[in-house]
């Protein structure tokens, strides 16, 4: 359950070799979706709304729209503005929301503490500082957000809408990419044979793509960048050939005047066709969402030096070819492959299919990542997360989501069988995410960057107007495919809101029904409580007080372990928590009670490894707390009040371990080994873990620096660990109180309970052994 030891922080100063290497690697991860858009943009634009004429006003107008859309949205908005709004190197919708949570104290997580604000990444980010002076409007806006819970919920729902549309894009992008790539076979065979080849081939490729997700991409990931690089070189070379061979004057269409002529001639039909032009910027959001895997400079270099010019040349080449071929539409749909020289069509078809698979892989991986972030922030049910690589940070696989995406992707592919309707659906999902980013960015500009409100207004009006124009053109196609992302987003949003609402109600019930520390301290006198050998971990969502499940447990079984730990594993609104800040440890009651509280903090992008090192880290953190408590004479007060212990920040085993030392069992069995050898470094420990899993023993070092009383407490801690660790968890069944409204009964009794029963519980998330786990059932009337 420890964060993976990958390097997730972007270096402040990188060598040019590192930057160029990252720029090259980003081609396969970030730009796969954006690079394959030439496959279907013209085909979707000229589907029905407008027609290609001999005056070339339509094709030149479309090219002008494509050029300025790519220039203004991916280049100006994302490369030069949005990429700067990173959350300690991380990007995406939740990165913006996390920034707002910290700078405006707008937090959807119920178990937040003041101690969380002392985290290094909480206090520092690369875009601004909370110590900078705020304008009067910014201070007023911040105060309004902090005071009004309704506005906070609206902000959360806005972020969730963007997230749901990203998930919808994870369904639609593989479908339209693979289907458009395979459609190239129509130029090489008769229509009778083509209709029996195109759809089955696309479905087989999609099934294979999703079936291979379980194995991870690290084995073939090194091929992604070369495939996209080859594809970009291919389409740019074909574009240059078509420009010089068919129409060298096509560059004139880059003038905005052709957009005016296009709309003047086509009027409402031209406006409706913008839904197809919109597809030229699909995948732009990936530049920001995948920022955590690369760096700002590397992503900017890759886009400005290679991706942007290649795409412009490709679109200009297609327009140049179509400007000299006005009867193609009567024979074939206007698509990418008609502009490819006939001798190159089969090789280009193969490269296009490979590029489509790479682009689809990127959006699928991104969907897994954003669902994990939602789950960490309490906005998505707990799901099984499989780490497919021990070396590459963030390579995860979620089985349930993978198969849901595959079924939905096959359904829309088989149901539509048409690039136009697939494009309408994909376009609406893409532009909705961009609108959400624009809205959140306007708040970030004021609250986090501390810029003038005029700058925020200019940003949201300029880019919001462009995106609203495309959004309206996509929304008008509701019955022609655009209903799909809306339906998908509604279903996922309903599940997310239901889970978040149920989680909040459960936490509120725990807070209202927690028992006082006085009750816990008086147990041995009133009920004759027995203390048994071993270490007991009471899993709770509370950061203070004693949970109701423990009182319920002790009332029915009056005994608990000689060392008792109230364990809270929670997420905080930062991307990563450093190992030295992972644990908050405190004491409950007098020393002789041996009762502790441990709060384990993870960021929303931290990777939890499913292994048994968590127990060792927990024992180490408690031992370090005991040692430092004695050394600093800051002994925890023998609290008899409601609010118990003072918490101390303690790191993992790799950062501190002077209180106790760990030994492998093979070392202890050797009589020649001294009893107080130095602690192993993290790397050797990791190498030996596979051979001696769960065979680590802790020993108190023989040193005069440790006082007798402290040594005794440390020895009892190690003896309790050797006696066995028991996990005591609550299994709550939630029911709405009698007299609750219909919506609340539907949300709690049906929606939340259905999600809870069909997703992973706390025992699965902690990877606790079945034989050592005790679940305490309770009914929560909320």
From Swiss-Prot:
Membrane topology: Multi-pass membrane protein
Protein keywords: Cell membrane, Ion transport, Membrane, Potassium, Potassium transport, Transmembrane, Transmembrane helix, Transport
Signal peptide limits: none
Extracellular side: 40-61, 175-195, 241-270, 318-347, 417-421, 464-474
UniProt keyword annotation of Endoplasmic reticulum present: no
Record flagged with keyword Transport: yes
Membrane-spanning parts: 19-39, 62-82, 154-174, 196-216, 220-240, 271-291, 297-317, 348-368, 396-416, 422-442, 443-463, 475-495
Biased segments, Basic and acidic residues type: 664-675
Cytoplasmic side: 1-18, 83-153, 217-219, 292-296, 369-395, 496-782
Pfam families listed in its UniProt record: K_trans (PF02705), K_trans_C (PF22776)
Disordered: annotated segments: 664-693
Location in the cell: Cell membrane
GO CC, any one term: plasma membrane
Xref: InterPro entries: K+_transporter, K_trans_C, K_trans_N
GO terms, molecular function: potassium ion transmembrane transporter activity
Compositionally biased tracts (Basic residues): 682-693
Function: Probable potassium transporter.
Family of this protein: Belongs to the HAK/KUP transporter (TC 2.A.72.3) family.
Protein's name in the database: Potassium transporter 6
Originating species: Arabidopsis thaliana (Mouse-ear cress)
């Amino acid at each position: 359950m420890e964060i993976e030891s990958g390097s997730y922080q972007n270096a402040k100063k990188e060598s040019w070799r590192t930057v160029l290497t990252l720029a090259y690697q980003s081609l396969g991860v970030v730009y796969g979706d954006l690079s394959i858009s030439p496959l279907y943009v013209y085909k979707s634009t000229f589907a029905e709304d407008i027609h290609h004429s001999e005056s070339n006003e339509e094709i030149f107008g479309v090219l002008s729209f494509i050029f300025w859309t790519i220039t203004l949205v991916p280049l100006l908005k994302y490369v030069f503005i949005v990429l700067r709004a990173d959350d300690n190197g991380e990007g995406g919708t939740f990165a913006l929301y996390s920034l707002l949570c910290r700078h405006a104290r707008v937090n959807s997580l119920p178990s937040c503490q003041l101690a969380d604000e002392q985290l290094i990444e909480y206090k520092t980010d690369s875009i601004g500082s909370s110590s900078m002076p705020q304008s009067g409007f910014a201070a007023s806006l911040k105060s309004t957000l902090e005071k009004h819970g309704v506005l906070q919920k609206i902000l959360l729902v806005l972020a969730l809408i963007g997230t749901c549309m990203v998930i919808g894009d994870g369904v639609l992008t593989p479908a339209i990419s693979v289907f458009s790539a395979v459609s190239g076979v129509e130029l090489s065979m008769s229509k009778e044979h083509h209709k029996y080849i195109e759809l089955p081939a696309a479905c087989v490729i999609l099934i294979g793509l999703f079936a291979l997700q379980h194995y991870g991409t690290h084995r073939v990931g090194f091929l992604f960048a070369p495939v996209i690089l080859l594809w970009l070189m291919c389409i740019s070379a074909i574009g240059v050939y078509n420009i010089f061979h068919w129409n060298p004057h096509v560059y004139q269409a880059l003038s905005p005047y052709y957009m005016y002529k296009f709309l003047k001639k086509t009027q409402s039909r031209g406006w409706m066709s913008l839904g197809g032009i919109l597809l030229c910027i699909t995948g732009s959001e990936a530049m920001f969402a995948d920022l955590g895997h690369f760096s700002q400079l590397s992503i900017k270099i890759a886009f400005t030096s290679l991706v942007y010019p290649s795409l412009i040349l490709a679109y200009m080449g297609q327009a140049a070819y179509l400007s000299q071929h006005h009867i193609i539409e009567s024979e074939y749909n206007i698509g990418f492959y008609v502009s490819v020289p006939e001798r190159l069509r089969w090789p280009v078809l193969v490269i296009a299919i490979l590029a489509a698979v790479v682009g689809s892989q990127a959006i699928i991986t991104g969907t897994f990542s954003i669902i994990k972030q939602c789950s960490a922030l309490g906005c998505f049910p707990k799901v099984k997360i499989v780490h497919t690589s021990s070396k590459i940070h963030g390579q995860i696989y979620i089985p349930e989501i993978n198969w849901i995406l595959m079924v939905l992707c096959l359904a829309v592919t088989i149901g539509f069988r048409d690039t136009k309707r697939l494009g309408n659906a994909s376009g609406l999902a893409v532009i909705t995410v961009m609108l959400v980013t624009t809205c959140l960015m306007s708040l970030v500009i004021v609250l986090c960057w501390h810029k003038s409100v005029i700058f925020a207004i200019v940003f949201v009006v300029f880019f919001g107007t462009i995106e609203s124009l495309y959004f309206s053109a996509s929304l008008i196609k509701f019955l022609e495919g655009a209903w799909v992302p809306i339906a998908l987003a509604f279903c996922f949003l309903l599940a997310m809101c239901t889970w978040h609402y149920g989680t909040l109600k459960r936490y509120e019930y725990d807070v209202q029904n927690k028992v006082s520390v006085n009750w816990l301290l008086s147990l041995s006198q009133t009920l004759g409580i027995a203390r048994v050998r071993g270490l007991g971990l009471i899993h709770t969502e509370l950061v203070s007080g004693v949970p109701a499940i423990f009182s319920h447990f002790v009332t029915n079984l009056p005994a608990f372990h000689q060392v008792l730990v109230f364990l809270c594993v929670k997420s905080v609104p930062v991307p990563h928590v450093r190992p030295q800040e992972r644990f908050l440890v405190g004491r409950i009651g007098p020393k002789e009670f041996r009762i502790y509280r441990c709060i384990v903090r993870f960021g929303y992008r931290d990777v939890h490894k499913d292994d048994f090192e968590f127990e060792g880290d927990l024992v180490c953190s408690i031992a370090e707390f005991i040692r430092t408590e004695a050394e600093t004479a800051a002994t925890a007060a023998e609290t008899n009040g409601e609010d118990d212990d003072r918490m101390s920040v303690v790191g993992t085993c790799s950062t501190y371990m002077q209180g106790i030392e760990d030994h492998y069992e093979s070392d202890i069995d050797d009589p020649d080994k001294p009893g107080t050898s130095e602690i192993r470094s993290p790397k050797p420990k990791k190498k030996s873990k596979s051979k001696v899993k769960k065979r680590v023993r802790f020993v108190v070092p023989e040193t005069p620096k440790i006082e007798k009383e402290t040594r005794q407490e440390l020895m009892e801690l190690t003896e309790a660990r050797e006696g066995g660790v028991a996990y005591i968890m609550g299994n709550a069944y939630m029911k709405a109180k009698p007299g609750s409204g219909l919506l609340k009964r539907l949300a709690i009794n049906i929606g939340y309970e259905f999600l809870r029963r069909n997703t992973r519980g706390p025992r699965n998330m902690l990877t606790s052994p079945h034989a050592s786990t005790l679940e305490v059932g309770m009914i929560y009337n909320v």
